[in-house]
Amino acid sequence: GALKINGKVTDWYNPNLTSAQMVKKNNNDDYTDKLLSDAVSWYKSKYNDDCTQYDNNKDGYIDGVFLIYSAYDFATGEELGKTLDENLFWAYTTMDYNAESNLKSPNGGYYFWASYDFLYEGYGTDKVDSHTFVHETGHMLSLTDYYSYTTKDKNGYNIYSPMGGVDMMDYNICEQDCYSKFVLGWNEPYYVDKEGEITINSAATSLDSI
């Protein structure tokens, strides 16, 4: 594939807080920034790693952290009769803008926050499903959501969706589309300067597109 991600899956980091306590500390919607900082510090100490290998552009920040929490996401919790804060216990990608750059021991900056349960929300299967994680990784690569945050119907559902929902950056369906692949530099255009024949292969199995 065009993208190869290298990293490390750690043991669970325990902040010694219940989900209710985390909600109380999240008054300014930035407590996950502190969790990121604490978790990165814990990682450096536990694994004796300065994290320079995860700073490919040498800006003093880890290129990306997947911060996965063990609590239910709020929607799953709702199905099980548990009330969880929807602003905190959901999936999103953000940046700790207060983190300081450190070239010798890079700190966490850009990260996504998502529940472990998202791995099992698949389409009629009990197997591991990575759609939400792929969607959030798209954000980490600079892609935006391909739907409107503000145009909703009376039930609160998005009604403006140029991709019709059928896209990874829209409704977490399929894969990254041809436009996204082009924006990310995964495919290259043909420069036609003379008569000839070009074979366009399937976009699902190649990087070709029109």
Each language-model region and where it sits:
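Active-site-proximal segments of metallohydrolase catalytic domains
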Residues: G1-K104
